[in-house]
């Protein structure tokens, strides 16, 4: 199981040496086994990356993110055709019926709202948590009652104040956007490893979005990012610009402990479990087979 996430903040060169990632910076060299790497985030725009390394990362199922001038992830390198039965999965994906898509989306939205309720409880917003659990129980197939949007409005105002909106240009939204981007990349990576096309979503269907399916499956994980950010916010650690230390902290969301069916996993492992169960559910045409993560109090998963 891959478990490392790397943030490259200084210029230098990344290359392949004896099946390991070689990092050369400021006259020093470090190596990391490729089989340990899940995600690499390249923040420094002067970093050089060799083609053999990119090929080796793809072969090992690792994903690489590049960042824009605001140091937010803007591009992603994904493994291609790593699943041994690619055509089988493509046929499955193209033939998912509309009723099954709606049932799967119902489960996703319900778990997202339940996770939001947990975050509300963790932050002392008991009344909001109670209302969120009620909204979760009201989610219907396809979320025809739009309970997701109602929950979001209630949830964010409970966490960050009545005047807060996700469109505001502030430190909280910058931190949320950064963490969502990291989680989205991890979900997209796992989907491609299982042979799914990230562009073909269940609910998200924008023709301009190459990651619609990843945006479907990130939903129950968003509250994990929210809980991470609100802890930093309450501690007064969020500034107008995200510092290197804060980014390192936000990337830890990939390694926090979360639960699926009362078993504890790292976020990365839980994503794998979720995508694997999605495949089983689609194969058997049974949305109830989809296993979704439950948020726990923030604690790093202890790898064996």
From Swiss-Prot:
Signal sequence range: none
PANTHER family with a match to the protein in the record: CRISPR-ASSOCIATED ENDONUCLEASE CAS1 1
Task performed by this protein: CRISPR (clustered regularly interspaced short palindromic repeat), is an adaptive immune system that provides protection against mobile genetic elements (viruses, transposable elements and conjugative plasmids). CRISPR clusters contain spacers, sequences complementary to antecedent mobile elements, and target invading nucleic acids. CRISPR clusters are transcribed and processed into CRISPR RNA (crRNA). Acts as a dsDNA endonuclease. Involved in the integration of spacer DNA into the CRISPR cassette.
Enzyme Commission code: 3.1.-.-
Naturally occurring in which organism (per UniProt): Neisseria meningitidis serogroup C (strain 8013)
A GO molecular function held by the record: DNA binding
Disruption phenotype: No effect on CRISPR interference during plasmid transformation.
Intrachain S-S bonds: none
Membership in a protein family: Belongs to the CRISPR-associated endonuclease Cas1 family.
UniProt keyword annotation of 4Fe-4S present: no
Cofactor field: Mg(2+); Mn(2+)
Positions contributing to Mn(2+) binding: 148, 204, 219
Record keywords: Antiviral defense, DNA-binding, Endonuclease, Hydrolase, Magnesium, Manganese, Metal-binding, Nuclease
Protein known as: CRISPR-associated endonuclease Cas1
HAMAP family: Cas1
EC supergroup of this enzyme: hydrolase
Subunit annotation: Homodimer, forms a heterotetramer with a Cas2 homodimer.
Keyword Electron transport: no
GO biological process terms on file: defense response to virus; maintenance of CRISPR repeat elements
């Amino acid at each position: 199981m891959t478990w490392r996430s790397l943030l490259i903040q200084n210029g230098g060169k990344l290359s392949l040496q004896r099946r390991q990632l070689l990092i050369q910076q400021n006259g020093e060299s470090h190596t990391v086994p490729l089989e340990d790497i899940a995600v690499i985030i390249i923040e420094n725009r002067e970093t050089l990356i060799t083609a053999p390394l990119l090929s080796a990362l793809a072969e090992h199922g690792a994903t690489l993110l590049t960042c824009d001038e605001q140091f937010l992830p803007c591009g992603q390198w994904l493994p291609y055709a790593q699943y041994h039965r690619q055509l089988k999965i493509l046929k499955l994906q193209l033939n998912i019926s509309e009723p099954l898509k709606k049932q799967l989306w119902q489960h996703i939205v319900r778990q997202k709202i339940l996770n939001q309720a947990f975050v509300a409880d963790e932050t002392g917003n008991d009344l909001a948590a109670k209302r969120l659990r009620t909204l979760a129980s009201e989610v219907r197939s396809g979320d025809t009652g739009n309970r997701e949007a109602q929950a979001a409005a209630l949830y964010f105002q409970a966490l960050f104040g009545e005047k807060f909106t996700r469109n505001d240009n502030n430190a909280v939204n910058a931190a949320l956007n950064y963490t969502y981007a990291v989680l989205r990349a991890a979900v997209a990576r796992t989907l491609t490893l299982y042979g799914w096309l990230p562009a073909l979503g269940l609910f998200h269907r924008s023709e301009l979005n190459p990651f619609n399916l990843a945006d479907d499956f990130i939903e129950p994980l968003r509250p994990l990012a929210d809980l991470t950010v609100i802890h930093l916010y309450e501690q007064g650690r969020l500034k107008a610009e995200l510092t290197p230390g804060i980014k390192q902290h936000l990337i830890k969301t990939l390694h926090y402990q979360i639960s699926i069916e009362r078993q504890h996993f790292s976020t990365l492992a839980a994503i794998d479990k979720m995508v694997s169960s999605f495949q089983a559910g689609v194969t058997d045409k049974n949305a109830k087979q989809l296993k979704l993560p439950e948020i726990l109090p923030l604690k790093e998963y202890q790898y064996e």
